[in-house]
């Protein structure tokens, strides 16, 4: 295995398309997917140079298990493609008490990205790709203190916030990481 790419949310949409492209370019593709049935199906469709590993971005234990599985099987990761996300879902909270859209799209993504740095530091050309959307531009005001308040929950607004936070994190991470050597 020469080059390894890890893609979250890899069983459909952008993540699935990226997985197919990377596999066709000779990468070994790790598919991080919440739904086991869909993850296994994606692995079969993408081919022998792929491996499905269960990953639920709302569950820190699942994220830890995913990362531990990676460290057990791979010495280095060349590309981390952080794509997993949810949008426009009814209000719910994770077992940690976080609102689910923010937990998936921002908190879980950030947590895993920070862990992935250790697997990428020895690869000079390593890359982190954070998928976001223009939805962040629809935010009219910031209301940090009310993000867990179900009475004002709006699936659109929380999705917009999650994309803004993800993008802000990416800019801050880029400032802090100048060289893995």
Located regions from the model:
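Rossmann-fold NAD(P)H-dependent dehydrogenase/reductase core
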Residues: 1-181
């Amino acid at each position: 295995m020469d080059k390894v790419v890890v893609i979250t949310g890899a069983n459909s949409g952008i993540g699935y398309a990226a997985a197919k492209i990377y596999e066709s370019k000779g990468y070994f593709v790790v598919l991080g997917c919440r739904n086991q049935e869909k993850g296994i199906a994606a692995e079969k469709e993408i081919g022998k140079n792929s491996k499905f590993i269960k990953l639920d971005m709302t569950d820190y234990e699942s994220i830890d298990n995913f990362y531990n599985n990676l460290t057990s099987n791979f010495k280095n990761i060349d590309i981390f493609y952080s794509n997993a996300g949810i949008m426009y879902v009814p209000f719910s909270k994770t077992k940690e008490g976080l609102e689910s859209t923010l937990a998936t799209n921002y908190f879980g993504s950030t947590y895993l990205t920070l862990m992935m740095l250790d697997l990428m530091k020895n690869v000079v050309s390593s890359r982190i790709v954070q998928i976001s959307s223009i939805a962040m531009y629809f935010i009219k005001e910031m209301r940090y203190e009310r993000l867990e308040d179900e009475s004002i929950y709006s699936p659109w607004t929380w999705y917009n916030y999650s994309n803004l936070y993800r993008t802000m994190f990416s800019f801050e991470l880029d400032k802090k990481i100048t060289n893995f050597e």
